[in-house]
């Protein structure tokens, strides 16, 4: 929908915010938004918790990046998802930095780790590809998410900050590495992941790993 309608140059951050909510409300189980939608085009995408309004709403320009972070409260769960969308043809720098963020996202999602591991011990997996280029992001990699409860819910989290909370089966956490070039663009890729026992069906290995855990991507 964005690719089709952005070519006119008239599509705005607020247009997208309102259209996304209308799509969401077509579902039978939707009860409302889980947080105000973050809808940032170009430099506004580099503001991690940007809140669009009538005065700040920018048009989606060609050859830029558009970041949208949204979620809903449903009878059977709570969602929080971020996508970064190329409008037109992104620059080579944008492509490379997006790829580094995506590599970190995938590496964390595929992690296999022993019981009693905390989120802070896994955080480096999401950042290492960015660190190779001297880049980083200033927010946590993941926060706990409730089920038809709070979209930010502890005690589990994944971040550089020391955290002794063990990841346990059933915990749901966001996986959201990013990169932000102030005044230019923002990149974030976010799915929700659940901590599971490392069974062969989830890891792709020949047998279960009895003393290990892994993640299942829910989004």
Q: What name fits each language-model region?
A:
Residues 1-219:
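Active-site neighborhoods and metal-handling regions in enzymes and metal-associated proteins
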């Amino acid at each position: 929908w964005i690719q089709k309608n952005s070519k006119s140059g008239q599509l705005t951050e607020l247009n997208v915010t309102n259209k996304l909510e209308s799509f969401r409300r077509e579902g039978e189980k939707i009860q409302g938004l889980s947080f105000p939608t973050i809808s940032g085009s170009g430099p506004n995408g580099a503001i991690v918790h940007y809140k669009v309004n009538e005065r700040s709403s920018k048009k989606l320009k060609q050859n830029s990046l558009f970041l949208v972070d949204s979620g809903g409260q449903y009878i059977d769960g709570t969602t929080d998802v971020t996508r970064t969308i190329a409008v037109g043809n992104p620059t080579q720098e944008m492509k490379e930095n997006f790829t580094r963020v995506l590599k970190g996202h995938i590496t964390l999602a595929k992690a296999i780790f022993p019981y009693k591991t905390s989120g802070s011990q896994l955080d480096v997996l999401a950042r290492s590809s960015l660190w190779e280029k001297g880049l980083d992001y200033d927010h946590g990699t993941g926060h706990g998410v409730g089920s038809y409860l709070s979209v930010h819910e502890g005690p589990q989290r994944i971040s550089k900050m020391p955290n002794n909370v063990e990841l346990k089966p059933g915990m749901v956490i966001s996986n959201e590495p990013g990169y932000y070039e102030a005044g230019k663009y923002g990149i974030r890729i976010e799915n929700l992941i659940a901590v599971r026992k490392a069974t062969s069906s989830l890891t792709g290995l020949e047998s279960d790993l009895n003393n290990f855990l892994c993640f299942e991507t829910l989004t």
